[in-house]
Amino acid sequence: MTDLPDSTRWQLWIVAFGFFMQSLDTTIVNTALPSMAQSLGESPLHMHMVIVSYVLTVAVMLPASGWLADKVGVRNIFFTAIVLFTLGSLFCALSGTLNELLLARALQGVGGAMMVPVGRLTVMKIVPREQYMAAMTFVTLPGQVGPLLGPALGGLLVEYASWHWIFLINIPVGIIGAIATLMLMPNYTMQTRRFDLSGFLLLAVGMAVLTLALDGSKGTGLSPLTIDGLVAVGVVALVLYLLHARNNNRALFSLKLFRTRTFSLGLAGSFAGRIGSGMLPFMTPVFLQIGLGFSPFHAGLMMIPMVLGSMGMKRIVVQVVNRFGYRRVLVATTLGLSLVTLLFMTTALLGWYYVLPFVLFLQGMVNSTRFSSMNTLTLKDLPDNLASSGNSLLSMIMQLSMSIGVTIAGLLLGLFGSQHVSIDSGTTQTVFMYTWLSMALIIALPAFIFARVPNDTHQNVAISRRKRSAQ
């Protein structure tokens, strides 16, 4: 990329900057949840909603981000994304109640939903096609560093300052990014088709109310009748979307996608698989602090081996899948992740703390292999004219399943524990033990889906898409 103009390189730095902000925020909050609960006078069992409100908002807003960028311009939308993310961070730091914090996190989520996909779109428009892969590697590298720094930085700020600083550090960074975006980034626009607003609203309502209903009376205090009403509204909204999308060429996500068997299996497996794995980044630091008495900084440091294992495994995933095939790899990694989850719980409760970094490193390796395999399986056989829509739907499902996973983890803690789990409680470790056992079972269940995947070992990761028209 050395032959790119200076202006283009600066624009790539701005996109990389946004990727770093968004990825850092996905992990920096987890370590601070117990301290937030104490400061806000809430039970730790309710704090999972701090994560859910952000991730669910990202899932809801993702389908609109690309259309908005084409319609209004990538610079305008990227600038708006940074401003909303920064304002959300400020309001998070100023929050005095859990409800205020949840609203501020939702505002952050609107910005986060637009930042990454619009950043990818910007790279496509400013660099030559032959340099696109190198440019994407450059801008996504900070996004890989964010999860590595997030847990430890969050723990450090909580332990030596306060939880408010995990949000306040975004403000000067966001101001610099917003100014640089206005000054340096071109405002590319494209002719767009009419946005499927009806489909967008139906999906948004369905996802939001079903997730809220899943949280149930344990997390929200809603009555059983209200929860039943939410479930009914959510199901009706999703059914109406299916009717809306049938034979509709302008639907947000075409139902023709599901005629490709590997896409259907991969999407179902990704949804179920990420529900289980989405629990782990939330539960691990909470368990280390509340269940075992680790300090926030120590708990954050313990998360680093998991990220390192994930980053290291990415280099050889292609060779592994090509050697053994999708079915064997996905079934093995799904069951393996369940076993590693049990191993982590066992070694932690036995007090073998020196073993935990190695277990978490192994967990990161297994999870990374499974994620990469699920992603490529889902998209590899889609025809060209459906590839973009399929990728957008996969991105939305990834975020939605993570929010559901965190919600279920909070629900399990509430089911097995009292309203106020604390380090001093004699039943705390028992509560966490039952929760981890339930999580291990949930993590293993998608193996039944992956067992149905054709085990073609010759065309696994080479996504040289054949030119086909959608049927």
From Swiss-Prot:
The keyword 4Fe-4S does not apply. Its main location: membrane. GO terms for cellular component: plasma membrane. The chain crosses the membrane at residues 12-32, 49-69, 77-97, 102-124, 138-158, 165-185, 197-217, 225-245, 263-283, 286-306, 342-362, 396-416, 431-451. Pfam families: MFS_1. GO terms for molecular function: transmembrane transporter activity. It is found in: Cell inner membrane. Residues 1-11, 70-76, 125-137, 186-196, 246-262, 307-341, 417-430 are periplasmic. Residues 33-48, 98-101, 159-164, 218-224, 284-285, 363-395, 452-471 are cytoplasmic. Gene3D superfamilies: MFS general substrate transporter like domains (1.20.1250.20), Multidrug resistance protein D (1.20.1720.10). The keyword Endoplasmic reticulum does not apply. Belongs to the major facilitator superfamily. TCR/Tet family. HAMAP family: MFS_MdtD. PANTHER family: BLR6921 PROTEIN, MAJOR FACILITATOR SUPERFAMILY MULTIDRUG TRANSPORTER MFSC. This is Putative multidrug resistance protein MdtD. It comes from Escherichia coli (strain SE11). The lineage of its organism: Bacteria, Pseudomonadati, Pseudomonadota, Gammaproteobacteria, Enterobacterales. The gene is mdtD.
